[in-house]
Amino acid sequence: AAVPASASGVLLVDRAAIAENYRILKAAFLEKAVAAVVKADGYGLGAEQIVPSLVRAGARSFFVAQLDEALKLRPLLDRCHPAIALYVLNGLTPGTETLFADNTILPVLNSLGEIEAWSRFAQQRGTAQPAAIHLDSGMCRLGLPPDAVERLRGNPGALDGIVPTCILSHLACAEEPDNPKNAEQLAYLKQALTALPRAPVSFCNSSGIFLGRDYHFDLGRPGVALYGVNPTPAAPNPMRPVVRLLARILQIRAIDAPQTV
């Protein structure tokens, strides 16, 4: 590809490589279900261009960070396939319940307050509402902390009207296979799951997929590895490169070695 005369550079995005990376990750996940994280406009590479390739490669669940991202992608996903689950990682903000429900978008419930609001909305509508529930197993970013999980254990009615489609958590140090934090999070997650209704579990991010079968559960959730970033920094990159930058050379000069540049 040539650099247009009006541009100083061009970034090429290889959608076939993204699809191949999805297949590589699915194989590493032992051919179980693998979602695709396409937040921040597909990590800046263009979600609307990337999503159809991922659907053709087999992705049936997608994660974004913000509701506005999901609202933009929902029509495209519906055109690509009739049964695509679309999750919003940043959860349910006040007043957005109807937008989620009417557009078939699934909130990831990160707090007891969000669970209460979604349950109340379901009861007002008179129909059960699907959602994911996020447990903080040690990342300390989003999700229900241990005390909130124990409150749910003691009050299962808090989930009235909610159909958990997925229970997720996030590994903090998966790119370091020998980090004891990984095993600590796994042990806590197994214990915390006993407080909740049975549902598919999503624990593995890109690097987590390569930690092995014990960490896999039901649904992989890779992000950066889809776009060519090495999920195993201590080993060769198993992913195909996705982006290539072409830049125009502005000037070539010969100078003497003592001169500064």
Annotate the PLM regions.
Residues 21-23:
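Alpha-helical scaffold segments that flank or form the walls of functional sites
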Residues 178-261:
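Anionic-ligand-binding alpha/beta catalytic cores of soluble enzymes and soluble regulatory domains
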Residues 1-2:
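Short, basic/glycine-rich phosphate-binding loops at helix/coil junctions
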Residues 26:
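N-terminal nucleotide-binding beta1-loop-alpha1 segment
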Residues 5, 9-13, 17-19, 29-191, ...:
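Active-site-proximal beta-alpha core segment in soluble small-molecule metabolic enzymes
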